[in-house]
Amino acid sequence: MKDQEIRSILFDSKGYIWVGTYVALYRCSSDFSSCKRYDSSLPVTSVNSIYEDADKNIWVTFWRKGIFRYDRIKDTFVKYPALGKENNPFSVFQDDKKQHWIGTWGEGLYKFYPEESDEQVYMPVESVKEGELPENGTFFSIQQDKKYGYLWLVSSRGLYVVRKRVDNLVETIDISDISSKLNNIFSEICLDKSGNLWIASFNEGVAYINLDKPIIQNYPMPSIKKTTGLTTNIQAIYNDNDGDIWINQNRLGLGIYKKDSNKIIWYRD
């Protein structure tokens, strides 16, 4: 894994740490003393995302190579049908009703039905009001808040929030009061154990949203700019069961962000 840029991180329910890089997928022990690289059943390309759903299924998406499910018994991966024209699913999410969603690179948002036959596996999602949700959009990350049950979509065009419906339509929510206080160039969103949203950005560290207060706060992480001389460029963010925020920075790699002290403990330390 050394010298490989990290694209996605997952701490699974069995205690393993999954790491996706630009060229491979790894499963590591909790202390990183051992790591296994998966090659035989997976394409050699960039890992877009790694996700574990409520049924403990682990889903991995690959750049232009589709979506795969991990088979724990065989310790291998199962490939799913191609999605859209480009077969480039970027993010996977399961909501509180166990509905799966897939955000693609350039082909919009889909509902995902893993148990259905080929033609029914993916269903494109559109907004009730035409054009409010881009059909050709790129969605990097998906999360659901605990207060309203809305889906939060991090895209190449900014942040979208939608209300689910029983059909393949969604209603977009006006969040101008939130987005006006945030940098609009985001990379990923996660939820902490208190129900707060954390959004990683390319230019300004991470943003924190507490919907109960409500509070919107930016954490610019000046130590990164001081060390690299460049913008923060947080490419991945993950909240573990201990409440720690794990980040991946373009130059410095993997680190744990401590909100209370505003400090980052880098993996190399």
Residue ranges of predicted features:
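Carboxylate-rich, polar loop motifs that coordinate divalent cations or form catalytic acidic clusters
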Residues: M1-D269
